[in-house]
Amino acid sequence: MAREHAIGEATGKRKKRGRVEEAEEYCNDGIEEQVEDEKLPLEVGMFYYPMTPPSFIVSDALEPDFPLIYVNRVFEVFTGYRADEVLGRNCRFLQYRDPRAQRRHPLVDPVVVSEIRRCLEEGIEFQGELLNFRKDGTPLVNRLRLAPIRDDDGTITHVIGIQVFSETTIDLDRVSYPVFKHKQQLDQTSECLFPSGSPRFKEHHEDFCGILQLSDEVLAHNILSRLTPRDVASIGSACRRLRQLTKNESVRKMVCQNAWGKEITGTLEIMTKKLRWGRLARELTTLEAVCWRKFTVGGIVQPSRCNFSACAVGNRLVLFGGEGVNMQPLDDTFVLNLDAECPEWQRVRVTSSPPGRWGHTLSCLNGSWLVVFGGCGRQGLLNDVFVLDLDAKHPTWKEVAGGTPPLPRSWHSSCTIEGSKLVVSGGCTDAGVLLSDTFLLDLTTDKPTWKEIPTSWAPPSRLGHSLSVFGRTKILMFGGLANSGHLKLRSGEAYTIDLEDEEPRWRELECSAFPGVVVPPPRLDHVAVSMPCGRVIIFGGSIAGLHSPSQLFLIDPAEEKPSWRILNVPGKPPKLAWGHSTCVVGGTRVLVLGGHTGEEWILNELHELCLASRQDSDL
């Protein structure tokens, strides 16, 4: 009675009864809709089953641990718990087979529990199935929907749960992770290894059992999710329980998402339908499946050109501008849809285009936006910005004002961070002066404005270098034609910067300098590929001497002591590869556009560096 009085008083003080009534109305609306839908055909696996009355619960989202403040009569009938036994408690007690149990039953799926927790933390709706138990221990399947309820200010005040219970027949004596058949076996094994009276027995017993006493939810959500895919694979070899847990596809996806970021894992989602997350993570970590292949596509890109810029938008390659005959700046846009049965280049019809240019950059933001910056036009160098939404019904190039822009330039480098911010670095002015500045433009704001990134020191001015993103906001700069005293020389140095720092600063990447360690030869206009795991692959470009531009070099800039290593790849690589004409598609495909004969580019011929297994047929 005291608990009920305290709960009632608290809800009265914060005027929450009105919200509960709203929640009940929400539930009643659901019943009415359900009755209306009874005549509709139901498929196996659908969420609602009209023959089973739904249970409704409401929890307080403003209190820690989401305590229950309301359950309906159906809940009491199906679970065997009275309202006064459960109000003020988190509803996880339904995962316990016995009311006195201290942890949930091992057959309850920890991944579903983790997903529920994530949805509650992010304030989004959840739908799924979960094993529950009646008060007497009878197993139930709970088809559950959780929906947040917000107040006028948008604050989540309550969470309503709609539950459809059905009895299930499962073998409760079977555990999901059979680490040991009996605890006695563990005791006997420990006794054999270490006498029970020795200090080693106690040390071994505590160390061995400590982590296994954690629930699967804690292991998955709080421990495994914080590790790299490589570390998770190693942990999976420790015992059968951890092996089963690390083999769970949802756990593997959660590990990859936390290690690589939501944007990258979202891009890789289509690959997991063929390879699944475990194999994909292994192949991207070990690079065991990497290979070159060559294919041709249809269509025509006319007029012929060089010095164009290309990028990937989903599974589409986009080409803009370039240098035509007699150094004519071109302003057309072409797209190649790799999902098509017979991919072919097609011109994008637009009402107006940005001024023609070459030596510019073309980037993809927000999944479907194309962003053009700078380059050399008819009247000299440019510093304008144009955006086109490729998914729009009628794609249109629109100029972005951007406040005070950077100096006009060409042969600069650009990249995108956090999916929506354009970063521009270096390049060359009309007078031939090399630049060392770095600018950022956030195109998601109402009035995008260029912002220069102030640093106490910057790498030598350069053009033709590469910018590669790793760790979400960190950038690796490599190569280019850089100032070296009074000379301009190809560079082989690498630098990093973290734009999330309060005071970002450039740092030269200090690589291991052991005898015999390989380093990429100095180069410019090369290819730099950012892998999902944060490593960077360098190849191609303009190189002096007898070095092969097709040799691949790999580095992990996040390592404490980074070192370059050569990546030997089977297959026939392209003879030449340039950064402005190479795209990364889906995180696992590096496409090099065309070879060329003299001044003529062959854009119907593509070389692909496959970072993961391809299970479809060649194009």
From Swiss-Prot:
Q: In which pathway does it act?
A: Protein modification; protein ubiquitination
- Report keywords, A-Z: Biological rhythms, Chromophore, Cytoplasm, Flavoprotein, Flowering, FMN, Kelch repeat, Nucleus, Photoreceptor protein, Receptor, Repeat, Sensory transduction, Ubl conjugation pathway
- Which InterPro entries does the UniProt entry name for this protein? F-box-like_dom_sf, Kelch-typ_b-propeller, Kelch_2, PAC, PAS, PAS-like_dom_sf
Residues annotated as domain F-box? 211-257
List all membrane-crossing ranges.
none
Where in the numbering of this chain does the PAC domain appear? Answer: 127-168
Changes seen on gene knockout: Late flowering.
Q: Mind telling me which GO cellular component terms the entry cites?
A: cytoplasm; nucleus
Which sequence positions carry the modification called S-4a-FMN cysteine?
Answer: C91
Taxonomic superkingdom: Eukaryota
Compartments in which it is found: Nucleus; Cytoplasm
Give the GO molecular function terms: photoreceptor activity
* Per-repeat ranges for Kelch: 304-354, 357-404, 409-457, 462-513, 523-571
* PTM: FMN binds covalently to cysteine after exposure to blue light and is reversed in the dark.
Give the record's GO biological process terms.
circadian rhythm; flower development; negative regulation of cellulose biosynthetic process; positive regulation of flower development; protein ubiquitination; regulation of DNA-templated transcription; regulation of gene expression; response to blue light
Other noteworthy facts: 'Adagio' means slowly in Italian.
Stated role: Component of an E3 ubiquitin ligase complex that plays a central role in blue light-dependent circadian cycles. Acts as a blue light photoreceptor, due to the presence of FMN, that mediates light-regulated protein degradation of critical clock components by targeting them to the proteasome complex. The SCF(ADO3) E3 ubiquitin ligase complex is involved in the regulation of circadian clock-dependent processes including transition to flowering time, hypocotyl elongation, cotyledons and leaf movement rhythms. Forms a complex with 'GIGANTEA' (GI) to regulate 'CONSTANS' (CO) expression.
Instruction: Tell me what this protein is called.
Output: Adagio protein 3
This chain's source organism reads Arabidopsis thaliana (Mouse-ear cress)
> From which lineage does this chain's organism come?
Eukaryota, Viridiplantae, Streptophyta, Embryophyta, Tracheophyta
